[in-house]
Amino acid sequence: MVEFVNDPNFKDLVVDTTIDNRNDEEPMTIRNFTELMIQFYKLGWMRGSGGAMGCISGSELMISPSALQKERIREQDVFVYNMKDKTEVQRPPNKRITVSSCSVLFSLIMKETGSECVIHTHSKCANLITQLIKSNVFEISHQEYIKGIYDPFSGKALKYSDTLTIPIIDNMPSESQLLEPIRGVLENYPQAIAVLVRNHGLFVWGPTWESTKIMTECIDYLLELSIEMLKNNIPLVNEEAFEKEDNLSDKMRTLMFGDMAPV
């Protein structure tokens, strides 16, 4: 595996380091990072050493290690990179531990979307929903937890009546091979804040670590709810949402990234 510091997307990643922690109520620290990883393990998102997280805090980028049991992660196990000079400033004492294979996916997503946090989970419902839905998108509308999802076009939260759309891509033998499919998602679904990987899991990204955590929790709830709705033949998208989508489709296509609120 090529050293992450040589990853072209990491090298091109530019962050405004004059803005500290943006709107986070609590700054991201290595201690908070490890505590979140343990919490995600307990939620069933990162079992068997799977799952990962990358987060920018000030001038530093923190990324979880690969093949390490997340419930036993320590502060010294986190990889830390300097965003200004693009150097590695911390790595685990155990030289056999490598940075997450998702690192190149995180840098791509951060570079293309301006996000400062990406969470990758292996939750059971994220896997199952991709097997129940045969299309290349997951959609759901008229659910309260949709209001917990950030809209990068407006800079505000989605409304209850909005349709949440999450693209679905096929799994690959290794996570690094998901680079081009995820690039395609970012190009074709610029409003997306997440992507599902069939038979695998979920990636969620956002402007802060707190908003990304909240969105991941909301999406996981909506995926679990959707599985039960499908079991009971309840449509995931309300008919009213289909009508609204037709009316908004032309408008959404005209929106440019320059019109977006800061991410």
UniProtKB/Swiss-Prot annotation:
One of its GO terms (cellular component) is cytoplasm. One of its GO terms (biological process) is L-methionine salvage from methylthioadenosine. GO terms for molecular function: methylthioribulose 1-phosphate dehydratase activity; zinc ion binding. Its EC number is 4.2.1.109. Pathway: Amino-acid biosynthesis; L-methionine biosynthesis via salvage pathway; L-methionine from S-methyl-5-thio-alpha-D-ribose 1-phosphate: step 2/6. It is found in: Cytoplasm. Disulfide bonds: none annotated. The active site is at residue 144. Belongs to the aldolase class II family. MtnB subfamily. HAMAP family: Salvage_MtnB_euk. PANTHER family: METHYLTHIORIBULOSE-1-PHOSPHATE DEHYDRATASE (PTHR10640:SF7). Catalyzes the dehydration of methylthioribulose-1-phosphate (MTRu-1-P) into 2,3-diketo-5-methylthiopentyl-1-phosphate (DK-MTP-1-P). This is Probable methylthioribulose-1-phosphate dehydratase. It comes from Caenorhabditis elegans.
